[in-house]
Amino acid sequence: MNTARKLFYYNGGFLRQKRVRRILSMAGYELTLGLPDRGDMVAVWGQSPNQYRGQWIAKKRKAGLLRVEDAFLRSVQPGRAGDPPLGLILDRSGCHFDASYPCDLENILHHDPLKDTDLLCRAEQAIMRIRDNHISKYNAFETTQSPPAPGYVLVIDQTFGDAALRASGAGKAEFKAMLAAARREHPDANIIIKSHAETILGHRRGYFSAADATDTIRLLATPISPWQLFDGAIAVYTISSQMGFEAILAGHTPHVFGQPFYAGWGLSKDRKPTTGRTRILSRAQLFAAAMILYPIWYDPYRDRLCALEDVLDILEAQSRAWRDDHRGWVACGMRLWKRPHLQSIFGRSKRIIFQNNLAKAHHPDRRRVFAIAGLGCDAHPAFVIGGRPVGHLLRSARAQSIGTDDRRYSHPAPRPKSPRRAVAPTGHWGGINEI
C-alpha cells in the first residue's frame, strides 16, 4: 500500500534533480503534477523567484506548502558545478533565513528543551569532527594552503541578490556599511574579504571585487578552508552567510548585520536584532537544532536516509578524493579494457590522460601520475596502482575498488608500503554508485 503523501510541484528543478526527488520520496512524499486537493502539499524551492506560482496554487486549493532547501552541509562542489546535495531542509512553516515569520527551525530553537545529554554530546563531537576535518557547506579547497598571517578581521562576501540577503533587506549599501564598520572598529588590523565559493568558480558575482582592495584590505578569491581563516581572525563580520554560523562553531562571536537563523540566541553581536528571539542557547544547542534535528540527511551509496554522522563520513571521504584528484591524473601502462573503469574512479574532477611511456608522464598543469605496478616505477615519483578486485575470488566481476600505494607495489616489499591510499580512506570506489 502506497502511503506517500502527494507533493505537487511547478518548478522544473524538481523534475531535473534526481537526488532531490529520491530524498523527497524516502521522506514520504510523492512528487506529482496537476492540481492539489485540500490536505495535499505543494513544494517550492525556498524563496526562489518562481515560488509565487506554487504559493498561489497552494492558497487557492487550500493545500499545505513545503519549502525545500539544501541542507547546511551540501556537497564538495556547489550545485551549479554539478554536485547533488547530501541532505535537504523540508520546512512546513517558513524559510530558515527569513526572520519575518517563524520557520520549523526557529520553532525548535524556541520551544525544544535541547537538554538531552546524548543529543548535546553528539553535537559537540560533530562540531569537533567538522573543525578537525575542515568540513563546510562546500568543500572544494585544499587544506594545505597557507592562510594569511594571523591578526586580521574577516569580512564575508555573499552572492549578489541571494534570497537570504533579500530576506534580511540587505544589498550593496549594507555590504559597504559592514566593511566600513570593520575598518572603523579595527583601525590597526588588516581586513580579509572572503569571496563566496560560487563567486570563486565564476558562477555568480559577489558584492565585493578587486576594486575594494587597498593596502590594508585584501580580497581573498581563492579556495581555502574557512576553519583556517577562523583560526587567524580577531573578528568576523557577516550579513547572513552560513560562514557566520561556522564562525560560532569555531569559537567566534560574529558581528551579524542581517537576520540569519543563528542570530539572536546570545552567540552573535547583532547589528539588526530580531524581535522575539530572547532565549540564550549554547553552541551545542544551536548546532543540535540546525544540524541534527532540522535537516533530512541522505547516504547516496546505501540509498537511505541517515544520520549527520554518516554524512560527515561521506564528506570526509569525498573531500579527500577531490583533493587527490582535482588537478587530474596521468595514467601509465594501462590496458585499454581497464581505462573506462579507472576513468570512472579517478577522472571525476578531470579526465585522465593515458600515457604508455612513463618518461613522458610529466604534465605542465601539475597533474599527478600513477602507473601499473612493474612499469619501472622504482625510479619515478609516481603512484603505483594494482587493479586487483577486493573480492578476488570473483575474478570475472568488475573490481569494486582500486588499491593504490605511493611507495611500492604490495607484493615485493623491501621498503615500507603506504596503505593510506587503499580504498575507503580515499573515497576511490568504482563499483558503488551514487544515486
Model-derived features: where do they sit?
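Catalytic-core helical/loop segments in enzymes performing group transfer/polymerization on anionic/lipid-linked
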Residues: 1-435
